């Protein structure tokens, strides 16, 4: 049986949390005396007004959550946050279209970074801050944040954690899941604060520094500038952002060991992080070499532009410092391959994730060996441990579903009216939560020109991709809702 009362209670509590974040924007708008202040006040009141009856409906709820309940909470949390998160855009009139307002908000909470805005700098400070905050909240997950306070309801939170934690592994830092979530957010906040200070040291204004630090740590990519990081024209800022995108693509369990335990050997001996670094280095070297050959850039600039782009795309952050569509075609075509890779499991990034790619590569390698040595026993090992057959099956299923979703979305986008290249780019950018793509969704364009039908399909794909495919797809299965 689905524990609807507990779900209502959690949803109500989540809306109170969102109202708290919205109230920060009220203070900011009041400080700058800008016209978005009434929109934030109204949005906050509406959010609280809906949260109260939901909390009331959850009174005397049975204090337990099944795994099925966890999947419902996670998916509904993202949808609910996006529905109420779009209110400031819509009420203020800066994004007067419901489709566009919901698209911008879902792109924020899923940390996709795709935007329908053609003039970002026209937004007042409150909306710009809210836009960045949607990514910061979504980066580590609305639900992981809630796990830290779920003991208020007497719920341990493991079911929510299992549904939200990205990738096939997410090592628990401590035996208690609520303590784990608190440590994760401590590291998350620490990275954001440190980057803010370093960006300010590079003469980026305080407001811009905070916004970019939030969206970097979340690997989201929303910027306060239409031309993203390129607007600041600063090699120092580019290197700072590159470094923090790289760190944010690492498993947060490993960041805990690195920063709080000083376990350098264990961190840099991790199989996945070695794969992560190797793929980043490989693509950086290839694109740097390509730029040296095909462009007038020098070595330092070629390396800086290449490393920034590769790390931005592989961590699915989506910041840009150059219009790579102006580069040689083989170079910008590489971007579509990079977006598939993703960063580490247990990070804020989207995409397939390095651990899955690693396991798939080793499964394929073993198949070749098995042909030559039919009787050999060839386990797939990660960090010296054999990967369970169930994990291998899950990874293979993920790849299969991911590819099927790409082709289904690709075909549907072309039926909507997009051309071959644009349809593919929109689908992969949405599903992998990357943001910038190629063609009409390249770094020099917004997504505003897309038909509404394409935007809604992108919204669905952003949500599916952010919640690791199966979480959302399970809810679409009739068997999920059958009573047992």
Residue ranges and their predicted role:
Residues 1-484:
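Membrane-proximal intracellular helices of multi-pass ion channels
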């Amino acid at each position: 049986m689905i524990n609807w009362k507990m779900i209502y209670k959690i949803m109500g509590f989540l809306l109170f949390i969102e109202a708290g974040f919205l109230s920060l924007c009220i203070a900011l708008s009041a400080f700058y005396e800008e016209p978005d202040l009434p929109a934030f006040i109204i949005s906050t009141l509406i959010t609280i007004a809906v949260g109260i009856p939901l909390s009331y409906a959850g009174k005397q709820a049975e204090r337990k959550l099944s795994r099925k309940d966890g999947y419902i909470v996670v998916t509904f949390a993202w949808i609910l946050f996006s529905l109420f998160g779009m209110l400031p855009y819509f009420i203020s009139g800066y994004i007067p279209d419901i489709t566009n307002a919901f698209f911008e908000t879902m792109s924020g909470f899923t940390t996709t970074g795709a935007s329908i805005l053609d003039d970002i700098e026209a937004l007042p400070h409150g909306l710009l801050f809210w836009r960045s905050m949607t990514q910061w909240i979504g980066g580590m997950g609305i639900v992981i944040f809630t796990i830290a306070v779920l003991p208020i309801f007497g719920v341990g939170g493991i079911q929510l954690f299992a549904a939200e934690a990205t990738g096939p592994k997410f090592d628990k830092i401590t035996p208690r899941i609520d303590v784990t979530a608190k440590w994760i957010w401590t590291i998350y906040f620490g990275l954001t604060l440190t980057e803010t200070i370093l960006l300010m040291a590079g003469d980026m204004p305080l407001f811009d520094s905070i916004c970019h630090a939030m969206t970097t740590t979340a690997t989201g990519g929303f910027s306060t500038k239409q031309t993203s990081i390129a607007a600041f024209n600063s090699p120092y800022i580019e290197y700072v952002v590159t470094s923090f995108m790289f760190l944010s693509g690492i498993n947060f369990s490993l960041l805990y060991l690195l920063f709080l335990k000083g376990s350098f050997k264990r961190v840099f001996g991790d199989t996945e992080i070695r794969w992560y670094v190797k793929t980043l280095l490989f693509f950086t070297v290839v694109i740097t070499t390509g730029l040296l050959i095909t462009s007038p850039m020098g070595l330092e600039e070629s390396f800086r532009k290449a490393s920034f782009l590769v790390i931005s795309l592989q961590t699915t952050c989506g910041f840009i410092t150059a219009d790579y569509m102006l580069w040689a075609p083989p170079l910008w075509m590489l971007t579509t391959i990079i977006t598939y890779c993703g960063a580490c499991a247990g990070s804020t990034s989207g995409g397939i994730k390095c651990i899955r790619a690693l396991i798939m590569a080793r499964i394929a390698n073993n198949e070749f060996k098995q042909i030559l040595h039919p009787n050999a026993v060839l386990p797939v090992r990660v960090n010296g441990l054999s990967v369970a057959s169930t994990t291998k099956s899950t990874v293979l299923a993920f790849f299969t579903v991911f590819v099927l979703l790409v082709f289904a979305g690709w075909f549907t986008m072309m039926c909507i009216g997009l051309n071959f290249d644009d349809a593919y780019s929109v689908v992969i950018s949405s599903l992998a939560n990357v943001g910038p793509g190629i063609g009409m969704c390249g770094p020099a364009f917004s997504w505003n020109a897309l038909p509404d039908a394409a935007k809604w399909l992108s919204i669905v794909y952003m949500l599916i991709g952010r919640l690791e495919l199966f979480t959302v797809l399970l809810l679409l299965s009739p068997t999920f809702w059958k009573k047992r």
